[in-house]
Amino acid sequence: MSHRVLVIGSGGREHAICWKLSQSPKVAQIYALPGSHGIQLVEKCRNLDAKTLDPKDFEAIAKWSKENQIALVVVGPEDPLALGLGDVLQSAGIPCFGPGKQGAQIEADKKWAKDFMLRHGIPTARYESFTDTEKAKAFIRSAPYPALVVKAAGLAAGKGVVVAANAKEACQAVDEILGDLKYGQAGATLVVEELLEGEEVSVLAFTDGKSVRAMLPAQDHKRLGNGDTGPNTGGMGAYCPCPLISQPALELVQKAVLERAVQGLIKERINYQGVLYAGLMLTRDGPRVLEFNCRFGDPETQVILPLLESDLFDVMEACCSGKLDKIPLQWRNGVSAVGVILASAGYPETSTKGCIISGLPAANTPTQLVFHSGLAVNAQKEALTNGGRVLIAIALDGSLKEAAAKATKLAGSISFSGSGAQYRTDIAQKAFKIASASTPGLSYKDSGVDIDAGDALVQRIKPLSRGTQRPGVIGGLGGFGGLFRLKELTYKEPVIAEATQGVGAKIHLALTHEFYENVGYDLFALAANDVLEVGAEPVAFLDYIACGKLQVPLAAQLVKGMADGCRDARCALVGGETAEMPSLYAPGQHDMAGYCVGIVEHSRILPRFDLYQPGDLLIGLPSSGLHCAGFNEILTQLAASKVNLRERSPVDGGDDGLTLAHVLATPTQLYVQQLLPHLQKGDEIKSVAHVTHGLLNDILRLLPDGFETTLDFGAVPVPKIFGWLAGKLKLSAQTILERHNCGIGMVLILPQSSQLWRTSLPGAKVLGVLQRRSKVSGSPVQVRNFVEQLEKVASPFGGLGDRELPEELKKLPSNSDLSAPREECFENAAGRRLTRIPTHYKDPILILGTDGVGTKLKIAQQTNRNTSVGIDLVAMCVNDILCNGAEPISFSSYYACGHWQEQLAKGVHSGVQEGARQANSSFIDSHSAALPLLYEPQVYDLAGFALGIAEHTGILPLLAEIQPGDVLIGLPSSGVHSNGFSLVHAVLKRVGLGLHDKAPFSDKTLGEELLVPTKIYVKALSTLLSRGKHGIKALAHITGGGLSENIPRVLRKDLAVRLDANKFQLPPVFAWLAAAGNISSTELQRTYNCGLGMVLVVAPTEVEDVLKELRYPQRAAVVGEVVARKDPKKSQVVVQNFEASLARTQKMLSQRRKRVAVLISGTGSNLQALIDATRDSAQGIHADVVLVISNKPGVLGLQRATQAGIPSLVISHKDFASREVYDAELTRNLKAARVDLICLAGFMRVLSAPFVREWRGRLVNIHPSLLPKYPGLHVQKQALEAGEKESGCTVHFVDEGVDTGAIIVQAAVPILPDDDEDSLTQRIHKAEHWAFPRALAMLVNGTALISPEVSSQ
């Protein structure tokens, strides 16, 4: 529905309001009373002169509005509001954007306004009001605060305020304003205020009288001259948004100023709708209100409204109808507007009229605006000065500094004849001077993450890793994964077993009491003991360490403990990951996870339930203490009971001077040396259970259906530490059985006749005997004599109680739809997943990788969008092992949290499983634990472990073969991926943006953008890597350390690379981060992927073959080359044109997003490609598909539009008399939707010449051939019949001919020997889905242009 609007006023503010309202498709006509020359030039606008309507005759305005069906009256200046225009209009039933006379008092009567603030607790300066000059001056001289601000209580056109330098000046102002009535009756009452110190900021807000919504903060410049010198004016310039007010301060203004004011008006029964303007001083004690205004500010309006994305008519209508809380209020992010006022000579005391103005731009543009404040036109159509403030020159840019420079330059290009113009050249300077002085550029180290410390740790633990090497290990630490060669072992039919473990809250004990090596040993022992359960030999181990602040000596001791365990088990420590996450972990906090890979002969896999016989023995091997079970609750309860763990132990070890902490921290017993030789013989041990979930629970895992047993502790003493624990915490015997190992760390099933437990397993005890199950009900495990044994050791410490302990380890069900394994994966008799080596590998190399998601998790937790981080986890791990040429085979994860929330954990877990599916990997298992001592209630951490296999001859990188001249091919990233998020958090904090705020670089929220999952490159690369000769010499996953640190991992020291940033897209998120955080280009390249998620090093002769596989589906491109490194001191990575690319992207963000219409006639597959591309911010297409038009009803393309939430129209050509009439209707609808660009995507209509001319340079088509060959229809048939070797597609400008317009992009597709029309068409479609978005990007960023007069480039 189209509406008519009346705007009252004639200045720059009203010009800006009319300009913004004209952009609303709901507004058909705007009348301005009395208006101005500039307003008259705005589309849809028309001036009303005083002869038609007297601006001071309110009744006549109301009557005219009724007669002319005015839907809304917008009052610009304060005077009509103060005189009651709003009341007259409301009485006549005409919606008025602006308050009535009572509401306008908030500006019109400064005494009333100050009293109002006092009544409602709104923070403001101290004050007194006077009608007597002598009393006012006496107060100034005696006030207990600097009473130096003198204000006329009434309206004085923004000039009735004097900020005096001293009491003498203030008294002089009293004499002028009150004594001489310089501003007439406006100064008959005087307000004398305290002089506040700080920066002034304007916060304007929309209100409907019930709710109030703040606009972006702005800063006005009141003084006439540079450096805030000279007299006060109505305002000499402004900029928006103003960075001087922080987000917390803005939130305080919302609550303590705006909301209190609206509530105060409600309490005083004053109806108020329109703008509530708060002029603020940012003092050391917080924001204080200097004044309220009842209307838009001038010149703030002129820099605020260009940043408003919402429809201004909708907002104003909502204010007048009490529905402001029902509409979204959206602003352009990442853009600043700066306006410089040009005033006539003599202003503010007088104004020089009639001076000729020259240099005015011909028209406003999206980045440059001029609004008229006091400008007239003579008979010769020359622009003349016609007031004090004549016009405002405005520039918009992604950089505040650039916007200020451009606005000042624009002002300087405009001149007034005669005495010339007055304008300031320092508008906004204060903001960026303060910003640059107080906010130096952020770095990753500033955000709490020290890459150098991580590198130092790697160097420190390399010798520890080397000390664990064994037959099979290839390479060392510092690459992308750990490598192990199976051929060096003696297995005939090897099967892979995997185990993931954590040490729980025992790490809290270790950190508190500095038992770092002990807990590192624990971690390895738990994982290695787990693989023994299937009869496997532990051969390789990875660790994951997470912390708030990396302390290299501490982390090195943790790893030393792991390395000691590895040596004891003859298992190799092949790699690990250290994650420094200051926003997830407090300084000093740590957690760890471990992953062990074992190998077992297929015929030796345990358990062998099929061999069980009644009479078989349950043999228990002694534990070394509590191991790692239940420490979260143990430590919590002991602390609550005020037990001092530094006291000498009253149980084991106390006689040797050990403290309780020493005893509790005793490392987990490692059983590899004891058991592995007997497991590999395979003749006696039928089953193994590692006791980690409590003795009772783990014995249950040994019993298949049909068997039971009775555990008898008559001859099995319980270690004293369990008695002490039960006595101190008043635990029940059942809880000790269910939550702790009771002195038994491993349980075996042996034949009744076996003597193994007597001869070869020191300390082994018979716990029970297997029996056939006699009854279905009841537990298959009964226990005798345990209570008695436990009571013996508990009685010295108070005896047993009835307290229970919660389960710390959690089990999550797998989603069968997502967790379907590869065919090599199978389950043993106990349901544990194992993996056969795929038969096509002749010399298989196991490749292991681990990683986490970093503080990206914090964003998931804060936005409650937790599913996608599981995909990130898989991506980070599998992308790493791809770099060694691996085929990902399996994946395991670790999940630890503060408070167990099952639905949350399931959501995270489903994401991990989805990632494993995308990576074509079997999901093996997740170790999950609730650890309140380590994590806050809503916090969790994730670690992942990937296993892949490569043929020995296919291992990457081929370091010796990489040479200068080799080509770099880049695969684009999907955004930030999962590294550098600590720096992201620091930037968000600096700029005061929240995760639910709209992203400054897209239409999504920041949370949505930052949580886009890391791209998994398995599908992209697996086909290539599976070929014997693929031409790829190296792959570099651009992960933590960015471009600068990851590409060198696949280079010799004598080589470097030269990248060209013009050849790959820098995702806008990085341009925004750089600007918002003042991050240097070097730091950006050292922290982030900058748009390249994976870099391939390819022999020059193989480039085309590689690109044939990757260009269209993956948007791969040549991005650089390998060069000789001439200076060993210089970086191995040089990125040319990076600054230019960065500036180009930042400039793009400062511009309005282009609005695109797509015209279709059918399925709309290219429409879908355009929608997907424009909604993927990483592709950097600064545009949105806003309208879809089809000439046919019911086609699939319309469904695609509906599913994407894009408005669509069916405009059938059959309903129109001629092609020209039909096309005119298209144009009408396109203009109503404010469309900038049109894409023809299978639109089966020949467009008329007038339509083509109307949209020339903004109208493009995609054609399924390599033009100029085969224009028109049936092009695939023509190409096949002609025996062509290749075909493809062309995106071109549309002109009056048939497919003759200038070409923008072409994409070639080979024609294969067995191709028919259908197969060739399908392959061309894939090329089209690459080419069309690429062409649109060129069109949007201005690299594809065509002259309006010609049809070829």
Swiss-Prot record:
EC number assigned by the record: 6.3.4.13, 6.3.3.1, 2.1.2.2
Recorded GO CC terms: cytosol
Family membership noted in the UniProt record: In the N-terminal section; belongs to the GARS family.
Residues annotated to bind (6R)-10-formyltetrahydrofolate: 1219, 1244-1247, 1261, 1295-1299
Cofactor: Mg(2+); Mn(2+)
Residues in ATP-grasp domain copies: 114-321
Protein name: Trifunctional purine biosynthetic protein adenosine-3
Cofactor binding remark: Binds 1 magnesium or manganese ion per subunit.
GO biological process terms held by the UniProt record: 'de novo' IMP biosynthetic process; adenine biosynthetic process; purine nucleobase biosynthetic process; purine nucleotide biosynthetic process
